[in-house]
Amino acid sequence: MTRPTLILFLRVPAIGRGKTRLAKDIGKVEAWRLSRAMTAGVLGRVRDPRWRLVVRVTPDGALAGAEPQGRGDLGQRLQRAIRANATGPVAVIGTDAPDLDRAHIARAFDSARRHGAAIGPAADGGFWILALSAARARSVGFEGVRWSTAHACADTVTALGGEVARLETLIDIDDQAALTAWRARARGRRGPGAGPGRPAERPGG
């Protein structure tokens, strides 16, 4: 059996670039710090011998050893990356879901094997993972998807066609409301001692 491929879509953190909605709420420097923490956290959590990790970055060439995302909108870049790795099952993730771990990824691959496709909805209407069988990955397309809106997950399901299993909903941190919601959940899980600057307050931690 061909080992699955996990593709991490990554925007290399830089002050004033990316996380624009969050930066408007908490400032560019703090948004950059959070972005760095989330990126480091995901990179530390998702490596696993059960799958091959491919990192695709923007801007192109911004991270040594990573592959460029290239030109086009998000759908075009995702399509290229997925089809290029469709020798076996493929899943794609980003860095915005701080609760994402190896168990989530393993369940997504398992669902894709059974149903052909699986998607993990984000609380804001986007998605935190898309997993596809090799056959579905080879023909994947994202026509009509309204990216960076509350319709992105539903539009992606429509664009995929066929059966798509739905996984659990996770929080994607794109603005202050999502950050506040995530911190409240993290404090609830880790207890009342988790205050500012402690692990419950650090998405990558």
Give the ranges of each region predicted by the language model.
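A short, N-terminal amphipathic alpha-helix
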Residues: 33-51
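Short, polar loop motifs at secondary-structure junctions
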Residues: 55-61
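Short, glycine-/small-residue-rich phosphate/pyrophosphate-handling segment
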Residues: 131, 135-157
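Short phosphate-binding loop-to-helix
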Residues: 62-90, 149
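Conserved alpha/beta core of the MobA/IspD/sugar-nucleotide pyrophosphorylase nucleotidyltransferase superfamily
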Residues: 154-205
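Conserved donor-nucleotide/metal-binding helix-loop-beta segment in metal-dependent transferases, i.e.
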Residues: 100-126
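N-terminal nucleotide-binding beta1-loop-alpha1 segment
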Residues: 1-22
